[in-house]
Curated annotation (Swiss-Prot):
CDD domains (UniProt xref): RHOD_YceA
Keyword Disulfide bond: no
Function, as annotated: Catalyzes oxygen-dependent 5-hydroxyuridine (ho5U) modification at position 34 in tRNAs.
Provenance organism: Rhizobium johnstonii (strain DSM 114642 / LMG 32736 / 3841) (Rhizobium leguminosarum bv. viciae)
Assigned protein family: Belongs to the TrhO family.
Protein name per UniProt: tRNA uridine(34) hydroxylase
EC category: oxidoreductase
Active site annotation, chain numbering: 184
Reactions listed under catalytic activity: uridine(34) in tRNA + AH2 + O2 = 5-hydroxyuridine(34) in tRNA + A + H2O
Single GO BP term: tRNA modification
Length: 309
């Protein structure tokens, strides 16, 4: 992360997850919510029996206070996180949610606390994925892979992570090479994806430690095998090498990332439609979206943020 980015971007963004058994996870919800609100921290944290997952943003001191609280809990003493910066607050509110799982794949008895793939550091990733004996798999969804991916990676074109297991089972050719290298945004989906692959009989299964975000942070652009931008689940929409904020916008009708060029399409209307969703929405849908967009515009005039923006 460059000093200039730090100086011009006042909000610290922390992406984190940790798989660990947390029997009394519900007891953390209220104090964590209060601590975040008191420190000006916003975002989403998911708590479950299997651990914690989420992304939060706020002033540096606020983020550090939340991380210190979490690491003071015995279960989360080994919690790791990834940092980036944002020029404006990328979240509207703070939500601490209780869940059955911290990432949902829909397959029973997959436990990353018991079996998981081999972690590969960002500095060693290029060597692994350049090996002709390695199949590289992007475990993210189609709207994420559309704006960036590693060269030569297989794209399952899934709409949700729940579709990933079926894609694997329908592609026996994945067994044709001895090594499988997998990656996702921050690493959490690969925890379950690699555990699933091991359960399906794949022996040499690897995943990028810290995900794409860690790779973009640590690997110089001139050495990078990453093409494009990385979709992130906040109002920045995408980040690039050095974790610099990307130039993508979000279509608030379909939640797909779009480029500045795509906003010149006759099918684009802010908050209403884009070339990705125009033909999949009805005129009634677009009328509803226009009404919402009108409310957003009114809220901005009043100096407020509409909750649906």
């Amino acid at each position: 992360m460059t000093d200039s980015l730090t100086h011009t971007s006042p909000f610290l963004v922390a992406a984190l997850y940790h798989f660990v058994s947390v029997p009394r996870f519900a007891d953390l919800q209220a104090p964590l919510q209060t601590l975040c609100e008191e420190n000006g921290v916003k975002g989403t944290l998911l708590l479950a029996h299997e651990g914690i997952n989420g992304t939060i943003a706020g002033p540096d001191a606020g983020i550090h206070a939340v991380l210190a609280f979490l690491r003071a809990q015995p279960e989360f003493s080994g919690l790791e996180h990834k940092e980036s910066r944002a020029s404006k607050m990328p979240f509207l509110r703070m939500k601490v949610k209780l869940k059955k799982e911290i990432v949902t794949m829909g397959v029973e008895d997959i436990d990353p606390n018991k079996v998981v793939g081999t972690y590969v550091a960002a500095k060693d990733w290029n060597t692994l994925i350049s090996d002709p004996d390695t199949i590289v798999i992007d475990t993210r969804n189609d709207y994420e892979t559309a704006i960036g991916t590693f060269r030569g990676a297989l794209d399952p074109k899934t709409k949700s992570f729940r579709e990933f297991p079926e894609w694997v089972r329908q592609n026996p050719g994945l067994h044709n090479k001895p090594k499988v290298a997998m990656y996702c945004t921050g690493g959490i989906r690969c925890e379950k994806a690699t555990a699933f692959m091991k359960a399906e009989g794949f022996d040499e299964v690897y995943h990028l430690k810290g995900g794409i975000l860690k790779y973009l942070e640590e690997v110089p652009q001139e050495e990078s095998l990453w093409d494009g931008a990385c979709f992130v689940f906040d109002e920045r929409v995408s980040v690039e090498h050095g974790l610099k904020e990307g130039e993508h916008r979000l279509c608030h009708a379909c939640r797909n990332p779009i480029t500045a060029e795509e906003t010149t399409s006759p099918l684009y209307e802010e908050g209403v439609s884009c070339s990705h969703c125009y033909h999949t929405r009805t005129e009634e849908d677009r009328l509803r979206y226009r009404q919402r967009q009108h409310q957003i515009a009114l809220a901005k005039k009043r100096g407020q943020r509409h909750i649906g923006s």
